[in-house]
Amino acid sequence: KEGDEILVPANTFIASIIAITDNGLTPVLIEANKDSLQIDENEIEKAISFKTKAIMLVHLYGQSSFTEKIIKLSNKFNLKIIEDNAQAHGCKFEGKITGSIGDAAAHSFYPGKNLGALGDAGAITTSDYELATTIRTLANYGSRIKYVSEYTGYNSRLDEIQAAILDVKLKYLDIELEKRKKIADLYLKIITN
């Protein structure tokens, strides 16, 4: 409800903040861990208040933000975990793929991403059937039945061309990620200052 708080890393992209504020919620910025550049698990608990409802984990730089401590805190305080998986397609935490671990996840398929479409594209994933139904309805003008709108919705459907491109590219994601890792390792080896 309006005024509820979502914990979010301070070093995130503005889109993560807008997703919170556009829904009448309050972002509470949490500093990043200086080593991982992910949300600092040691700063989370002191930021939790009676208004805190969720932690938004923004998986940055191809790394998972998940830690055992964050999962324990979410359970202890009954907080939802929302994943921003825009920069971490194919990333794993304890054998599970990011974007499939939290309560819901946002995925960007902007052309510059690891898994990019030809134009703007995105998706939301969740294992919560009721939430998935609401999201699908909102994305289709608020309608489950043609010309009957339950909500004020959006035109936010993934078009067939973008879906076809992503379907092909997804088959090669692991290979492409491995190539990126090799290039990054080469940079780290060559650039010494």
Map each language-model feature to its residues.
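Radical SAM/AdoMet-radical enzyme domain recognition
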Residues: L73-N78, K96-A104
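Active-site region of PLP-dependent enzymes
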Residues: A88-E94, I101-N193
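PLP-dependent aminotransferase-like
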Residues: K1-N85, K92
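Residues at secondary-structure transition points
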Residues: N11, D35, I39, K96, ...
